[in-house]
């Protein structure tokens, strides 16, 4: 059988060849009439027309056709790249047999694309092929480098790889004392009151008192207080601060936020404020017919409440009564307050109505006291503003001593917290400063009283006896002050001499350490010069430089922390020394007073003994005195050895 082919569209080169009559006519290959180039020639899914080997012309090609074939092959390559066609199966044309590289390239692409292939896609396709070429170039570059390497370089690379593979020991982190979270919200009322109670002894949690105090000052003119909710993120921030046992500054927040915080605290109480046992009895009492019976029963039940529960209930009702009194500005009456407060504290509206309408009868003696926070001294560079009068100083000392006892109790219980230890030192510093200020205030008050007395005495006409008595009192006070100042001056001079000796020894130690440092630096410079000469031999020893650098940085950081601790300790030692000087002055004054009192007693005893000797002989009884009586009198006249030893002991204590 013979096969028939449709005449393909002749190319310009074939047309010229036909005109000149050069070469033999050849049959078209399967590639030239493939369905990809002529999509309308064959149906989709039909196989290509078979090639019969018998009908193929002989492989006799002229030199012109060979040149033309090469040009055509190049043209086909460009055409494939630009058009982006892909063969569905292998072609068995004569051209592909001559150039097997074409078959390999056609196998790599198995995607049929549209005939229209833009330049942009062609660029993208070329960019995708670039990384392979770059990798090939890098591999060649590495091979060249590996050929050029010497033995020393290979050893160096091996050491670096080994060092990278070695697991570097992670630095041991310093133990950090993480403070335990001791929440205030959600715990029983008694526990919260005992933990956060302040110096005045009112058994209420600090968060409750501070919130009420802030709203009493800043929230009485806010419309819809306790009804309008605050910002939730701010409320959560305040709650977290109180759970960390901090005292945030409520001045930075709105009254609505603080009111929402108070409601949240009351809502999270694990037990009802009126207790589970008494709550139904309160309901029964408020449901009675007559008002007198209701009041009498409520008063009796309120006395049965625990101390913390009664205190919280009374403060809450009195505070809400203050809010109701400002109804014109707050827009909150009894009904609104009851609607807001009833689901929060889980008390019915009927009970709350009885409480709010009979505040004076049920909670008449309750007064809301302001919270005064203890003084802080966080910045060592500045001195805090201490109170001026003696009463305020004493009150602040009571606050600080109460806080100091609480901190000591918590630290002795095993709570490890660096912030509490720092607060302990801070409270001790404040206490020493307050006590010093109190002594100065007492001295100033005494001086002012003396000046006032002198002024009043100069103006008034008084007798000489009164003047002498007052002058004696004034002189005694002045002498006592003078003695105190002199003894204090002596102690300060002794302390100054001791500190000067210590400074001299410290300077000598500094000079010695500087000499050692200079010697070590000279050794290091000498060692560096030697290592530079033999650097090729000591490459292995320089591997640990990074570790040494890290150790040095760690030591420097530890040194900074120790310096901070040292400054705190020095400050505390200085304050303790001042306290010791004051105690020594007081001891010396007491010893002097004791010596004076003993001398006065001796003089009185001698005076009593001399009185009977001056009486007339007639009045004396006719009894013979013993022979040893003069000796006994002489022994009484002599100072006792106990007094001498007492004086010696006082001098030894001063030394």
Curated annotation (Swiss-Prot):
Catalytic activity: an S-substituted glutathione(in) + ATP + H2O = an S-substituted glutathione(out) + ADP + phosphate + H(+); ATP + H2O + xenobioticSide 1 = ADP + phosphate + xenobioticSide 2; leukotriene C4(in) + ATP + H2O = leukotriene C4(out) + ADP + phosphate + H(+)
Residues at which ATP binds: 69-74, 413-420
Pfam families given in the database record: RhoGAP (PF00620), RLIP76_Ral-bd (PF20924)
Basic and acidic residues: bias regions: 52-68, 119-150, 619-630
Comment text on domains: The Rho-GAP domain mediates the GTPase activator activity toward CDC42.
InterPro entries: RALBP1 (IPR039767), RalBP1-like_Ral-bd (IPR049041), Rho_GTPase_activation_prot (IPR008936), RhoGAP_dom (IPR000198)
Region (Disordered): 1-153, 520-548, 600-655
Subcellular location: Cell membrane; Cytoplasm, Cytosol; Cytoplasm, Cytoskeleton, Spindle pole; Nucleus
Biological process annotations from GO: actin cytoskeleton organization; gastrulation with mouth forming second; positive regulation of mitochondrial fission; positive regulation of protein phosphorylation; receptor-mediated endocytosis; regulation of Cdc42 protein signal transduction; small GTPase-mediated signal transduction
UniProt enzyme class: translocase
The name this protein goes by in its record: RalA-binding protein 1-A
Gene3D superfamilies for the chain: 1.20.58.90, Rho GTPase activation protein
Subunit (UniProt): Interacts with the active, GTP-bound form of ralB and ralA.
Region feature Mediates association with membranes and could form transmembrane domains, mapped onto this chain: 149-214
Function of the protein: Multifunctional protein that functions as a downstream effector of ralA and ralB. As a GTPase-activating protein/GAP can inactivate CDC42 and RAC1 by stimulating their GTPase activity. As part of the Ral signaling pathway, may also regulate ligand-dependent EGF and insulin receptors-mediated endocytosis. During mitosis, may act as a scaffold protein in the phosphorylation of EPSIN/EPN1 by the mitotic kinase cyclin B-CDK1, preventing endocytosis during that phase of the cell cycle. During mitosis, also controls mitochondrial fission as an effector of ralA.
Ranges of compositional bias, category Acidic residues: 532-548
Region Mediates interaction with RALA and RALB, residue ranges: 398-495
A GO cellular-component term linked to this record: lamellipodium
Annotated region (Mediates interaction with REPS1 and REPS2), positions in chain: 496-655
Residue stretches of biased makeup (Basic residues): 69-79, 102-118
Location of the Rho-GAP domain: 187-383
Species this chain originates from: Xenopus laevis (African clawed frog)
């Amino acid at each position: 059988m013979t096969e028939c082919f449709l005449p393909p569209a002749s190319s310009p080169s074939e047309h010229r060849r036909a005109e000149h009559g050069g070469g033999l006519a050849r049959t078209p290959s399967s590639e030239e009439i493939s369905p990809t180039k002529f999509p309308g020639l064959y149906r989709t899914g039909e196989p290509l027309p078979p090639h019969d080997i018998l009908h193929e012309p002989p492989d006799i090609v002229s030199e012109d056709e060979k040149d033309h074939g090469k040009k055509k092959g190049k043209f086909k390559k460009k055409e494939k790249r630009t058009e982006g066609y892909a063969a569905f199966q292998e072609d068995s044309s004569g051209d592909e047999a001559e150039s097997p590289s074409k078959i390999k390239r056609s196998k790599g692409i198995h995607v049929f694309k549209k005939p229209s292939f833009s330049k942009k896609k062609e660029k993208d396709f070329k960019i995708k092929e670039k990384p392979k070429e770059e990798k090939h170039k890098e591999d060649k570059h590495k091979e060249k480098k590996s050929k050029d390497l010497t033995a020393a370089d290979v050893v160096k690379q091996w050491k670096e790889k080994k060092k990278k593979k070695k697991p570097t020991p992670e630095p041991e982190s310093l133990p950090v004392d993480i403070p335990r979270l001791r929440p205030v919200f959600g715990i029983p009322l008694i526990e919260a009151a005992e933990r956060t109670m302040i110096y005045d002894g009112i058994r209420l949690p600090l968060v409750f008192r501070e919130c009420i105090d802030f709203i009493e000052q800043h929230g009485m003119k806010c419309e819809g207080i306790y009804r309008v909710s605050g910002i939730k993120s701010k409320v959560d921030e305040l709650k977290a601060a109180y759970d960390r046992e901090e005292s945030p500054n409520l001045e930075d927040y709105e009254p609505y936020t603080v009111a929402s915080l108070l409601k949240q605290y009351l809502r999270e109480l694990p037990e009802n404020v009126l207790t589970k046992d008494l709550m139904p009895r309160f309901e029964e009492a408020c449901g009675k017919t007559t008002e007198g019976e209701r009041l009498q029963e409520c008063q009796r039940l309120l006395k049965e409440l625990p101390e913390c529960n009664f205190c919280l209930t009374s403060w809450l009702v009195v505070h809400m009564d203050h809010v109701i009194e400002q109804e014109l500005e707050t827009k909150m009456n009894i009904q609104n307050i009851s609607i807001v407060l009833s689901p929060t504290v889980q008390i019915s509206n009927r009970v709350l109505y009885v409480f709010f309408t009979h505040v004076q009868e049920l909670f008449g003696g309750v007064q809301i006291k302001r919270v005064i926070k203890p003084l802080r001294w966080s910045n060592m560079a500045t001195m805090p503003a201490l109170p001026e009068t003696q009463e305020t100083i004493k009150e602040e000392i009571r606050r600080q001593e109460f806080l100091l006892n609480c901190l000591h109790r918590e630290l002795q219980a095993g709570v490890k917290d660096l912030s509490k230890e720092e607060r302990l030192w801070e409270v001790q510093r404040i206490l020493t400063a307050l006590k010093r200020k109190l002594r100065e205030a007492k001295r100033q008050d005494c001086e002012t009283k003396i000046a006032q007395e002198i002024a009043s005495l100069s103006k008034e006409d008084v007798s000489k006896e009164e003047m002498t008595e007052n002058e004696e009192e004034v002189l005694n006070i002045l002498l006592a002050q003078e003695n105190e100042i002199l003894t204090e001056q002596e102690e300060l001079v002794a302390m100054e001499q001791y500190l000067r000796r210590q400074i001299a020894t410290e300077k000598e130690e500094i000079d010695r350490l500087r000499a050692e440092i200079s010697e070590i630096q000279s050794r290091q410079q000498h060692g560096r010069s030697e290592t530079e000469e033999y650097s090729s031999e000591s490459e292995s020893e320089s591997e640990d430089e990074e570790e040494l650098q890290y150790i040095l940085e760690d030591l420097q950081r530890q040194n900074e922390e120790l310096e901070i601790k040292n400054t705190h300790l020095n400050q505390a030692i200085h304050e303790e020394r001042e306290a010791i000087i004051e105690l020594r002055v007081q001891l010396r004054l007491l010893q002097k007073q004791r010596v004076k009192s003993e001398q006065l007693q001796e003089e009185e005893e001698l005076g009593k003994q001399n009185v009977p000797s001056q009486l007339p002989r007639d009045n004396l009884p006719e009894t013979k005195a013993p022979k040893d009586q003069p000796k006994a009198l002489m022994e009484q006249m002599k100072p006792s050895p106990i007094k001498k030893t007492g004086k010696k002991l006082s001098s030894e204590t001063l030394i």
